[in-house]
Amino acid sequence: MDYISNTPSEKEAMLKKIGVENVEDLFKPIPDDVTFKRPFNIPPGLSELELKRMIKSKAARNISMEEQICFAGGGAYDHYIPAHIDHLISRSEFYTAYTPYQAELSQGVLQAMYEYQSMICELTGMEVANSSLLDGGSATGEAVLMASRISRKKKILMSRGINPVYREVARTYGRPRGLEFIDLGLNETVTDMEELEQKLDEDTGAVVLQYPNFFGSIEDLNVVKNLISARKRTLLIIVVNPLTLGVLKPPAEFGADIVVGEGQVLGNPINYGGPYLGIMATRKRYVRQMPGRIVGATTDSDGKRGYVLTLQTREQHIRRARATSNICTNEALNALTAAIYMATMGKKGIKEVGEQSFKKAHYMADRIDDMEGFEVVNKDNFFHEFVIKTPLPSAEIGERLKRKGILGGLDVSRWYSFDGFLVCTTEKRTREEIDGYLEALEVISSD
């Protein structure tokens, strides 16, 4: 409905009805020392032209990937997005963040979500996927809660090789539910498997690893699979970058019970703060513990194929005590974007993106490792991200590269006790851009 403000007479009638003299009486329970009393500093209204100028001026302070050459990763990646994707998702019948509430009236949207789920299952090797969560971090948190419900255990072993933001989100989700999080240390840039073996016991509800991990290193999931298979009701959660799965073995082959990840790489642009896309897939026997919505295919009484919301285990649809999640906003538009991207690229295209990213990263790492004062920490075991030790503090390296128009990487000392620079390449980076980065490093280190 249209918003129409209340008139003074309407306000007076409402106040009289509830038995108070003025609006201020409604706020008397608020302590006086925390009550905001000074006037709001709100400027006068602007015309449309003035407002556009103001917004453009503020937006000009942002730096886009068109203005800087991006060699940063750590959870958000600068991949090429085919031009037609934005056109298709902007169609009026698609352009909303929500899976439809009157599902049967929106067969096209539901079919798109069904295709998205099917392609996520094909990438991960899992049996069922939901129609999206908020982002990679929230998907990790939901996976931990889901694993605890299934295993009926509270102890969670979580590798320090997982994106540190994801780890913090998972703790935020799990601690109010009484979950106990125990970190698994690192052997350089991979999970310490001996420590995993020592800490893994019958009380462990889940083991969580990332593949490739935050440093770009590829964990030995065969070892993890063998360790967990000897335990009853201990689930394996694997956090993935879906674009690497065109080259790497799918998590299902390592016995994964729940697979989650960030779907930004599947056609969604880099945005500070999102919106991004949470991916989740699991085994069929766990489907009723999966949060979010699941679209299924069926036939009507005439034998015609149709799409329905098969499961909606959220608190808005069923009793709160039985709900698996209270997730409210749904990233349906981002999932649609991912579906169009995967359909556009196909198996061959997704594999090529992964291979190009891999080869360019290894070319770059080999060159950096040969430079005086630089060392690639995980040069023998990474996908398209790697950690380098630099002759200057990583924060300084990053700032000086930024002045040259290069987003050079991430300073991992923000989250870890060692100084390292996390560098990433994707299929977008050209030989000239990589060589320019290397030249910039040489100049910076020699100053």
Swiss-Prot record:
InterPro entries: GcvPA, GDC-P_N, GDC_P, PyrdxlP-dep_Trfase, PyrdxlP-dep_Trfase_major, PyrdxlP-dep_Trfase_small. It comes from the Bacteria. Disulfide bonds: none annotated. It is an enzyme of class 1 (oxidoreductase). SUPFAM superfamilies: PLP-dependent transferases. The keyword Oxidoreductase applies. Signal peptide: none annotated. GO terms for biological process: glycine decarboxylation via glycine cleavage system; nucleoside metabolic process. Its EC number is 1.4.4.2. GO terms for molecular function: glycine dehydrogenase (decarboxylating) activity. Keywords: Oxidoreductase. It catalyses: N(6)-[(R)-lipoyl]-L-lysyl-[glycine-cleavage complex H protein] + glycine + H(+) = N(6)-[(R)-S(8)-aminomethyldihydrolipoyl]-L-lysyl-[glycine-cleavage complex H protein] + CO2. Belongs to the GcvP family. N-terminal subunit subfamily. The glycine cleavage system catalyzes the degradation of glycine. The P protein binds the alpha-amino group of glycine through its pyridoxal phosphate cofactor; CO(2) is released and the remaining methylamine moiety is then transferred to the lipoamide cofactor of the H protein. PANTHER family: GLYCINE CLEAVAGE SYSTEM P-PROTEIN, GLYCINE DEHYDROGENASE (DECARBOXYLATING). NCBIfam families: PRK00451.1. The glycine cleavage system is composed of four proteins: P, T, L and H. In this organism, the P 'protein' is a heterodimer of two subunits. This is Probable glycine dehydrogenase (decarboxylating) subunit 1. It comes from Halothermothrix orenii (strain H 168 / OCM 544 / DSM 9562).
